[in-house]
Amino acid sequence: MFVLFTAWNYQVTVLEILAVVASLIGVWLGTTGTRITWPWWIVSSSLYAVLFYNFELYASAILQFVFIVAAIWGWFGWGKDGAQPSKLAMKEKTIWFVISLISWLTLAPLLAQIGAAATWFDSFILVGSVVAQVLMVKEKYEAWPIWVVVNMVATFHYARQELRFTSLLYSVFIIIAIIGWRKWLKKAII
């Protein structure tokens, strides 16, 4: 990978910088509920798929393809007026939680079998992100608190994997997710 510069003994590649910038733009636009967020998700996810694969973070690489599919779904699902946030019923919250827990506990051992770099963290990020992304596409404000938790885990995880700028990005995502949570909660249709 082409190194753009070195910061704090860390080689920053062009690929990682482009992925970080595209991700920041896409996630910030998501807080506004505007449909233009989705093309940015496609660009950033394409870049991160390559980066994560190169670091043997296979679940994170696969997740990027899920994001691309969700971005296409979101583009058509949100329509020209953007997101109209609503809340999940308690039964729906319980179902999503159980599905998430079972998926995480099932996926981590499978990743270990194929030699992934960090199975439990990587699988948690994959499962949590898929759930949050689906809820975001479905315009549910509960997507944002899930993003807060996933981004906290991802910040720690990517720092341990020596992806420092990506770790920094996810720490910024925590703040953006809190902002998105507040904005969407105010607009949520009860």
What is each model feature region?
Residues 38, 57, 134-137:
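Alpha-helical interaction segments
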